[in-house]
């Protein structure tokens, strides 16, 4: 099992990432605004299945990588820091958009909603990068099975992502209406997320390998 500090640290990173606008959030909000909160939740089920798929693939891959390549930890650490900096730039760059500035989508059946949610997540390269580059930062080979730690941390990320996205999907209509007349709030949201992610990136880059 991961150490308590690793669990809390990864939970904090996961929370910061799920609050950062991305393809999944934009799709879920668009779907909720178009068809209602229930449709957003069904779509979220497909997104969650995509998380499980990536978690299992990454868990086995991370296990093999950390055991086979001595410098894998540092390589993944810097890749993870770079990924967070890229997300921070996406949040604050000129012309950036809030996820609540969304397009209308066609009305679809529950089955199609689920499948589209799954495909949206599966085709999102940022999710693969999240598991490949960020998960290893919180794994300590001396704390037990690397595979077990990977699965536990992945499950935490999925639980946080599903919980937060469910609340966002259910409240999407009200939030979008609130922000539509308050553009300054959208700007504050983008800069807040960008600052948090940049801070996490710097911390990750300078953090020494656990022994």
Regions found by a protein language model. Give the residues of each.
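Juxtamembrane transmembrane-helix termini in multi-pass membrane transport proteins
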Residues: 2-73, 133-158, 169-172, 176
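Primarily residues marking transmembrane-helix entry/exit sites
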Residues: 3, 7, 109-114, 127, ...
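Juxtamembrane helix-boundary/capping and inter-helix hinge elements in multi-pass membrane proteins
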Residues: 32-39, 108-109, 181-184
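Hydrophobic alpha-helical transmembrane segments in multi-pass integral membrane proteins
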Residues: 55-59, 123-129, 197-210
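Selective transmembrane alpha-helices of multi-pass membrane proteins
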Residues: 67-97, 164-168, 172, 176-211
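Flexible cytoplasmic inter-helical loops of multi-pass small-molecule transporters
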Residues: 93-110
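A short amphipathic helical element positioned immediately N-terminal to and/or at the very start
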Residues: 114-122
